[in-house]
Structure formats: structure tokens, C-alpha cells
């Protein structure tokens, strides 16, 4: 019998602040930005809020929402890829305000028509993340309207002027200042902000930023990571949380990866339990499994969706995935130990892995178990270009890898032990899940993997209209309007 792993127990406590910083890191990678972009934006936003005379409670909202502003980016990455081809470079062009970034949208009905559904996904997911982390309701509200503008041309609800939460204006301006100053220099950045006065955000905030921006940016460049942490944390972000939400946000980037990180974590913990009674080791490998895919956000979806061998340029991006996971741990406090272990997920005993090309003795037992678990879960999962391997075929593949000296034989047998049953963390919110019928859960699982209503109908032998009815019922019962949030909630309830 395999153990049930609780990420809340036995670790260095994971604060909400640590989780928020990890999610900020993922968001920055998704947007093609430096990995301190969201933290710097948060600091600038807090200074702007204080200088503008905004009350202390709203200043805390600014701090929390600014770091989670891009937390919905993995959820709509597939949509950006469908429109632009490369979901990351297109976002860089958007943030930098390049005049040509909207050209592909004109033939598709215009900016609003194309971006409205993508903004809806992003805002609903980031708001849901704030709710799941226990942050203030005002933070959730700000994130659900993070792309609204002063002139009413924002998204998703086209709010305007005083109906837009004030933190949205502050965060939007601070984010623009951070990007523009870094890209074009301070003087031009202030000119670009002035052009957006009373369209994107109120003139009074632009005027305040213009007075202080040069000194703020100079001060910001001199701050240590500890200084940034002290300036950005709030009382709600001191609460304890677990790493499962990070795993779920990671996996939203590619619908066919839904549940992958949790499955790797559970498989690794179960395999570890077969090799050592050390419960601390079980928990370490479990948390590492949850976050091992953080760096995946740095690679465009069109690379991940390639059915054939990757060209060298794409392969180089993939090889850096565990590096970015390791870097996230340096920024995210209590996740440091887990990220160090997680960054070994793709190493191999013969030195053919990445990113370190580590060998033999350099790889701990936990690293070997994690590597075998990633391979096992990947083989047993369907991909757009292939069906899932059968248990026997996947087991043979793992044993062949061990025989060739790439994977550890003991780790492989531990992962395959007892029919490779995996542990599952006790789900939360089961009362919500109990309201869904068995057929609704079937439909929910299918749409969480990215299946269209037509594909779900074929898979479950239902009519498209029946599937649509089930989807509408699922959304109503889960109180959401997007598949991404339905997936987050279903995963938290243990339904996937």
C-alpha cells in the first residue's frame, strides 16, 4: 500500500509569499520577461500607490495583485500560440508596445475580438489563484479586471474610469514603467506613459510617476532580494500553503499535460517509499515532483507541440527547462531545496541528461527516483502525436533505459513496484465535487485535457448538444466560465 503524501507536513513551511513568488517567476517566463519583472513591478506599484495617497489596505492589494498579474499566462498560452504562433515572443512585443504586434489580429476580426476570450481566461484564472491562496477579496477582484483601462476599451468587462479598481491602474502603470524604462530608457518611458494618460490610466498617476520615476528606478536597481521581499510581503502572504497549486498552474500551459506534475510527484513519493523509510525523503521528492516543470513556461507551445524531432534551436530551449526550475528555487524561499532536487529531473547516470550533464555519484537516490518517475508518467500519458504506452510497454522502456545505464535500475523497479500504483494527496473541497454527476466528471476530465465538445462527444458516445449541456452544468456548479478554472478546481478536488 502506498503512502498518502501531505505537502503541508514535514517541510520547511511554504508561505503564500513563497508560492506567489514562484507563480510570479512562471508568469515572467511566460511573458518573455526577466525573472524579476513582476517583483520590480510590485515594488514600483507600491511606491506609486503610496505617493498617490492610496490607503494602506489598497496598497496591500497592489502588492499582492502585481506579483500575480501574469499568473494566468499559462492558461491562455495555447490561445496565444494559435493566434501568433509563438506565445512568448508575441507577448514580449505586446508589453513593449510595438506597433506591429497587432497586425495578425486584423484578419481575425480585430484586437478586441481576438483578445477578449484570452483575457477572460487569464483574468478568471489569476483571480481564482488569489482566492485559492487565501488572499484578500480585493486582490481577487483586481486580478479579475487587470486589463481594464480608464477609457473603457480594456478587457474583459470594458469597465471605465471609477468603476475600475484603483489598484488596476497603479499596477498597469508600474508594469509599463518597468518594461519601457528597461527597453527604451527612462526619458522615452515617461513619454510613452504620457501618451497613455487618461486612456490606460488616470493622468494624476502618470504625473506622480513622472515626478518620482528616475529616483525610484535608481533605488530599485540597488535593492537586494531581501529588500524586495520586505517591501512586497503582506500579512495574508505570511500564511502557510502547499505547492499543489503551483503544479496545477504549470500544467495549464499545455492541456495534454493536465495532472502531469501531480502524477509525477505521487509516483516519485511512492517509489521513494519502497526504497527508504525516510519520510522526509518521501516529502522532498513529492514537492520536487510538483514543481519540476516550472521551467516549461520558458518554452513556446509550438515547440512542445512538435510531433517530430526538435531542431537544435528548439532543443536548446528545452535543455534549459530544469535550469529555470532551479533558478525559481533561488527566488522562492522555502521551495529552494525542492527546486534543487527538481532541477535534476532530466539528468541521466551516463551524463547524457540536462542541464548539468551530471553523472552517477552526483545524482542522489531522490534524483534518480524523480527521473524515473518523470519518464514513467510521460510514457503512460497520451500526447497529441501518440497514444499512451501500455503499462507493459512503458515498463519495458524504463528497464531498457536502466540496462543502457541512463536510469538507475533500483529506482526504476521502485517506480514500477506494485503495478506502479501511485499515491494521491487527500483532495480538498469534496463537497463541491460531490455535486457533479459521474457523466459530468467524465466530461470535465475530457475538456481539462483540451478536448473540444465535438471530440468529447466522440470519446463518450454522446451528442454534441448533450456535451454542451454537461459543460454548462459543470461551469455553473463550479461557479466558473472557463475550462482553465474548471480544471484548477477539479484538480484541487481530486477529480482529475
Give a label for each model feature.
Residues 450-485, 489:
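Recognition helix of helix-turn-helix DNA-binding domains
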Residues 251, 445-449, 491:
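Short, locally clustered residues in the helix-turn-helix/winged-helix DNA-binding domain
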Residues 191, 207-208, 396, 445, ...:
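DNA-binding alpha-helical recognition surfaces that contact promoter or target DNA
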Residues 2-435:
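Histidine- and acidic-residue-rich, metal-dependent catalytic cores
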Residues 489-496:
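Intrinsically disordered, low-complexity basic tails/linkers immediately adjacent to helix-turn-helix/homeobox/MYB/SANT
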Residues 436-437, 447:
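Conserved acidic segment of CheY-like receiver
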Residues 441-442:
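Pre-recognition alpha-helix immediately N-terminal to the DNA-recognition helix
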Amino acid at each position: 500500500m502506498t503512502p498518502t503524501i501531505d505537502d503541508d507536513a514535514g517541510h520547511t513551511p511554504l508561505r503564500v509569499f513563497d508560492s506567489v513568488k514562484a507563480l510570479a517567476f512562471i508568469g515572467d517566463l511566460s511573458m518573455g520577461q526577466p525573472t524579476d519583472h513582476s517583483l520590480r513591478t510590485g515594488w514600483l506599484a507600491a511606491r506609486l500607490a503610496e505617493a498617490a495617497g492610496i490607503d494602506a489596505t489598497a496598497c496591500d492589494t497592489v502588492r499582492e495583485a502585481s506579483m500575480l498579474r501574469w499568473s494566468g499566462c499559462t492558461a491562455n498560452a495555447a490561445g496565444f500560440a494559435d493566434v501568433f504562433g509563438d506565445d512568448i515572443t508575441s507577448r514580449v512585443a505586446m508589453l513593449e508596445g510595438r506597433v506591429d504586434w497587432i497586425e495578425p489580429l486584423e484578419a481575425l476580426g480585430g484586437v478586441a475580438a481576438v483578445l477578449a476570450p484570452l483575457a477572460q481566461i487569464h483574468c478568471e484564472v489569476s483571480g481564482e489563484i488569489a482566492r485559492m491562496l487565501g488572499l484578500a477579496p480585493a486582490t481577487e477582484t483586481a486580478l479579475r479586471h487587470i486589463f481594464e483601462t480608464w477609457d473603457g476599451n480594456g478587457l474583459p468587462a470594458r469597465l471605465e474610469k471609477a468603476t475600475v479598481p484603483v489598484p488596476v491602474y497603479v499596477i498597469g502603470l508600474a508594469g509599463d514603467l518597468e518594461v519601457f524604462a528597461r527597453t527604451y530608457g527612462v526619458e522615452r518611458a515617461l513619454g510613452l506613459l504620457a501618451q497613455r494618460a487618461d486612456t490606460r490610466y488616470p493622468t494624476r498617476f502618470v504625473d506622480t510617476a513622472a515626478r518620482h520615476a528616475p529616483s525610484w528606478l535608481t533605488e530599485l536597481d540597488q535593492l537586494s532580494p531581501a529588500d524586495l521581499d520586505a517591501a512586497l510581503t503582506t500579512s495574508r502572504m505570511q500564511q502557510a500553503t502547499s505547492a499543489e497549486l503551483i503544479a496545477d498552474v504549470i500544467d495549464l500551459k499545455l492541456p495534454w499535460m493536465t495532472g502531469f506534475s501531480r502524477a509525477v510527484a505521487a509516483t516519485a513519493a511512492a517509489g521513494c517509499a519502497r526504497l527508504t523509510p525516510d519520510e522526509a525523503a518521501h516529502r522532498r521528492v513529492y514537492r520536487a515532483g510538483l514543481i519540476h516543470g516550472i521551467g516549461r513556461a520558458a518554452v513556446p507551445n509550438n515547440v512542445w507541440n512538435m510531433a517530430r524531432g526538435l531542431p537544435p534551436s528548439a532543443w536548446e530551449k528545452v535543455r534549459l527547462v530544469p535550469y529555470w526550475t532551479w533558478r525559481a528555487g533561488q527566488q522562492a524561499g522555502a521551495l529552494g531545496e525542492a527546486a534543487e532536487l527538481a532541477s535534476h529531473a532530466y539528468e541521466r547516470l551516463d551524463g547524457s541528461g540536462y542541464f548539468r550533464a551530471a553523472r552517477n555519484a552526483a545524482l542522489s537516490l531522490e534524483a534518480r527516483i524523480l527521473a524515473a518517475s518523470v519518464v514513467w508518467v510521460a510514457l503512460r500519458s497520451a500526447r497529441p502525436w501518440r497514444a499512451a504506452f501500455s503499462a507493459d510497454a512503458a515498463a519495458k522502456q524504463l528497464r531498457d533505459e536502466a540496462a543502457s545505464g541512463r536510469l538507475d535500475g533500483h529506482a526504476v523497479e521502485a517506480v514500477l513496484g506494485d503495478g506502479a500504483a501511485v499515491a494521491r494527496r487527500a483532495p480538498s473541497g469534496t463537497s463541491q465535487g460531490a455535486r457533479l454527476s459521474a457523466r459530468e466528471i467524465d466530461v470535465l476530465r475530457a475538456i481539462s485535457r483540451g478536448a473540444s465538445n465535438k471530440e468529447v462527444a466522440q470519446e463518450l458516445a454522446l451528442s454534441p448538444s448533450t456535451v454542451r449541456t454537461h459543460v454548462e452544468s459543470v461551469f455553473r456548479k463550479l461557479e466558473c466560465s472557463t475550462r482553465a478554472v474548471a480544471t484548477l478546481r477539479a484538480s484541487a478536488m481530486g477529480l482529475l
